[in-house]
């Protein structure tokens, strides 16, 4: 089995769990407040800022450099959305939630210790954005009564065909010079990334403590198996 397929199979349960959080299910039904949504946009800004900052450091790395793909970057789009939701002084207003900060800290931690694990975070975030972005854009637009503003996050102006691009992305994953041990560690990290996303979503629903305990216990169990 190639690495892209192993990564997909190895994160299937976590992916499904993330899609079934109360926040995501409400979002998919079009039940979301503007306040919750702009808080999500704010948290995503900090997550992507960390991920993209760290990937730039490794853009010439023999492994990570292959996934330095500026056309995927979301920070500029999120900045535009935050300006819409919070106004021109948004930088002095927004701050990461506790759940978001844990996510950001984890990204920086692996960048400094085992940088190849960043691949798990890269995969979890960007492939998901490409896969469901247009559907989520339509839901958010209708639920929040938006026109053309506040939705830049879902727009990939430099990617003409998401389906073809995802195949290219998977091909890059398959060609990465990784050992079996590194691949397994990346799959474990990708599962943890999904859990960190779930913690962020649950925080928006007010279930942060229970969610965080589940995340930590799940991560510990994954390390013991």
Describe the residue ranges of each PLM region.
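Metal- and O2-centered redox machinery and metal/ROS homeostasis
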Residues: 1-225
């Amino acid at each position: 089995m190639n690495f892209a397929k192993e990564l997909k199979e190895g994160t299937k349960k976590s992916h499904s769990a993330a899609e079934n959080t109360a926040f995501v299910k409400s979002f998919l039904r079009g039940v979301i407040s503007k306040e919750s949504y702009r808080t999500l946009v704010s948290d995503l800004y900090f997550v992507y800022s960390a991920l993209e900052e760290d990937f730039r450091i490794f853009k010439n790395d023999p492994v990570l450099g292959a996934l330095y793909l500026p056309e995927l970057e979301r920070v500029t789009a999120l900045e535009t959305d935050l300006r819409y939701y919070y106004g021109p002084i948004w930088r002095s207003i927004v701050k990461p939630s506790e759940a978001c900060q844990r996510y950001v800290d984890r990204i920086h931690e692996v960048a400094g210790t085992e940088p190849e694990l960043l691949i798990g975070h890269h995969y979890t975030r960007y492939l998901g954005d490409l896969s469901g972005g247009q559907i989520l854009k339509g839901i958010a637009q209708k639920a929040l009564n938006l026109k053309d503003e506040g939705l830049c996050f879902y727009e990939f102006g430099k990617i003409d065909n998401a389906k073809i691009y995802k195949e290219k992305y998977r091909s890059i994953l398959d060609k990465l010079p990784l050992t079996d041990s590194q691949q397994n560690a990346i799959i474990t990290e990708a599962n943890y990334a999904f859990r960190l996303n779930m913690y962020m979503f649950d925080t928006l629903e007010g279930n942060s403590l229970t969610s965080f305990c589940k995340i930590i216990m799940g991560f510990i169990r994954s390390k013991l198996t």
